[in-house]
Structures are given as structure tokens and as C-alpha cells.
A protein has these predicted regions:
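SDR active-site strand-loop-helix element
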Residues: 9, 33, 74-80, 116-122, ...
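NAD(P)-dependent short-chain dehydrogenase/reductase
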Residues: 139, 145, 152-203, 208-212, ...
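NAD(P)H-binding glycine-rich loop region in Rossmannoid oxidoreductase-like domains
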Residues: 54-96
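Conserved glycine-rich Rossmann-like NAD(P)H-binding loop of the short-chain dehydrogenase/reductase
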Residues: 28-38
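Conserved catalytic Lys-bearing alpha helix of Rossmann-like short-chain dehydrogenase/reductases
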Residues: 98-104, 143-151
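N-terminal Rossmann NAD(P)H-binding glycine-rich loop of SDR-like oxidoreductase domains
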Residues: 6-26
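Conserved Rossmann-fold NAD(P)-dependent oxidoreductase catalytic core, especially the SDR/UDP-sugar
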Residues: 74-76, 99-139
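C-terminal substrate-binding subdomain of Rossmann-fold SDR/epimerase-dehydratase oxidoreductases
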Residues: 192, 196-310
Length: 310
């Protein structure tokens, strides 16, 4: 399926940025829907084919009459109030996100798109194995699940093809400084020691560029109604990821493993089944963690004006 124009909410996050780059590199026009006043607007490229529209998620319903109706696919990656644990567990705020997702489906139809692809989270579900616990009683996870199921129903009613991608953990340029890997990078680049738990949690990290390709393949080849788990398919202890990150910056720097306690109810093994995504779309990651983290470090260095090992 060949697309000429796509629309993306959450375009300044790591997945959104990578998806923008993916389509622009292939000559596909992109409408990036960005929160007004976003400090991350500078992360977007400035090149032909990219149109930036400033609109908060609560106002998505106003865009149908303002944007062209020649779009082919809509990617809803935006989600408000995920900055910290307090907002992640605010029931009212996340109930609003469910409504925003349904407005995104309506906008998908108004823009002439044939397919809606939404970004979910591993927190929506329990693991695929008895010892693979990923579910937390958090408003964020509950709302993500509800948004995914209700948007599927609305797509069915509106005769739109629907796919939902449940992402475990991605990393790459554009990620928030507060995530574990970005905290690790930022601290090590200052020559300081980052503090962590023991880092024994088994984790799956996927480079944002690979994740973007997975979402593009969902839009092009995904099975209607499918909910795909999106990850690399490889589990490693978090402490290994931290060590590889440190080694890419300066192997002599210390890591403060075990200096922080685990949170209550901390899942120790996060995993899911990536085989349906591979079977339906042919997706497989192309970037090793070692390669992806080097690119991410370079991006942070450019932003901070520092050099590896400094």
C-alpha cells in the first residue's frame, strides 16, 4: 500500500520524530500535529513535505474543517500527562485521553484516511507467560487499554482499518531526560555516577527508528483489528543496558547499581509476543542496542554541547 500523505499526533516524541523522518525519506508528505508552545518543536526537521499544525489533543475535533482531506493514514501517538508518576496515576486526566483518542479516530475519517494506527503500552496487559507480569494498577495503563478497545469499536463503525501497537520501551533521539536511559546518558556525560536499582529487571528496548518502521508496516500491512506487541523480542537485565551505555561513553566511569530500592510492585520480567507483528508485517529490528545507544548519545551530545568521555 503506497501512501502520499500521513498525519501524526505526538510528532515530537521519539517515535513521532522517527516516523516523520521515515516518511519524509520516502517522499511521503507529513502533517505533524504538535502541542502549541511545545519546546520540542526544534526537534522536527525543516524540509519540504512536512507541515506542522499546532493543536492540543483536546482540540483535535477542530482540525477536520481546516486540513486537506487527501491523507491516507493517521498515527495517534500523542498522550497527555505522562511526565511523572503523579500525573500517570490521575484518573480524570487519563479519562480525557480516552476521549482524545476517539476524537483522533473521527479526525482520521474527516481527513480521508483509510487506516488508524494507535500507540499503546505494555502496561495495558498482563504478560504472555505466567511469570511475565507487566500489569500495574495505574490510571495510565487502564486508560490506554480503554482507548485502544474503544477506538477499535469506533473504527469499525466508521469503516476504518485499525491497528494498535503496544510498545514496551523505546529509546532514541527526542526521548525525555527523565527516562532511565536518558538519565544514564546525561549523568555519565557529566562524568558523574548515575544511581540505579540493582537493575535485575528483564527488559526489552527497541530503537525508535525500528519502532517507527514497525508502525509504518502496521499501517501498510497490518491485519485489521490487530493489537500488536511492539518490541525487539530480546530480553536483557537493565543493568546490562546501563553497562553498555556507560561503555559507549567512558568504560572507566562507575555505575551506582543497587543504590536505589525497587518500587513497590516492581515488575521484574517484562515481555510480550512479537511474533504476530513479524508474521503479519515482516517486521524485524535492524538496529542493535549497541548501535542505537551510540546514535542516541550523539544526539544528546549535540544538544548538551559535550563530547563522549569528557
Amino acid at each position: 500500500m503506497r501512501f502520499a500523505r500521513v498525519a501524526i499526533t505526538g510528532a515530537t516524541g521519539p517515535l513521532g520524530l522517527a516516523l516523520v523522518d521515515y516518511y519524509l525519506a520516502r517522499g511521503v508528505a507529513v502533517t505533524a500535529i504538535v502541542h502549541p508552545g511545545s519546546a520540542r518543536i526544534s526537534y522536527l526537521p525543516t524540509q519540504a513535505g512536512l507541515g506542522v499544525v499546532f493543536c492540543d489533543l483536546a482540540s483535535l475535533g477542530t482540525l477536520g474543517a481546516l486540513l486537506p482531506t487527501d491523507h491516507d493514514a493517521f498515527f495517534h501517538l500523542g498522550w497527555s500527562d505522562t511526565e511523572n508518576h503523579a500525573t500517570r496515576n490521575d484518573p480524570v486526566r487519563h479519562a480525557n485521553n480516552i476521549l482524545y483518542t476517539l476524537e483522533a479516530v473521527k479526525l482520521t475519517k474527516a481527513l480521508g484516511c483509510s487506516v488508524f494506527v494507535g500507540a499503546g503500552s505494555h502496561i495495558e496487559k498482563a504478560g504472555v507467560a505466567p511469570d511475565c507480569h507487566t500489569e500495574r494498577e495505574e490510571s495510565y495503563g487502564i486508560a490506554k487499554y480503554a482507548a485502544g478497545r474503544l477506538s477499535a469499536m469506533l473504527c469499525e463503525q466508521m469503516y476504518l482499518r485499525y491497528c494498535w501497537g503496544r510498545v514496551l520501551s523505546i529509546y532514541g533521539p527526542g526521548e525525555r531526560e527523565t527516562t532511565a536511559l536518558m538519565y544514564c546518558i546525561g549523568t555519565l556525560l557529566k562524568g558523574e555516577k548515575p544511581s540505579f536499582t540493582a537493575g535485575e529487571q528483564l527488559w526489552d528496548y527497541l530503537y525508535a527508528v525500528d519502532c517507527a518502521r514497525a508502525f509504518a508496516l502496521m499501517a501498510e500491512k497490518g491485519r485489521h483489528g490487530a493489537v500488536y506487541d511492539v518490541g525487539s523480542g530480546t530480553l536483557r537485565p537493565l543493568k546490562e543496558y546501563f553497562a553498555l551505555t556507560r561503555d559507549a561513553i567512558n568504560p572507566a566511569l562507575p555505575l551506582g547499581l543497587g543504590e536505589k530500592p525497587y518500587l513497590p510492585g516492581q515488575p521484574m520480567r517484562m515481555c510480550f509476543d512479537v511474533n504476530p507483528l513479524r508474521t503479519d508485517t515482516g517486521f524485524s529490528p535492524k538496529t542493535t542496542f549497541e548501535e542505537g545507544i551510540r546514535e542516541t548519545i550523539k544526539w544528546v551530545e549535540t544538544r548538551q554541547g559535550v563530547k563522549t568521555g569528557a
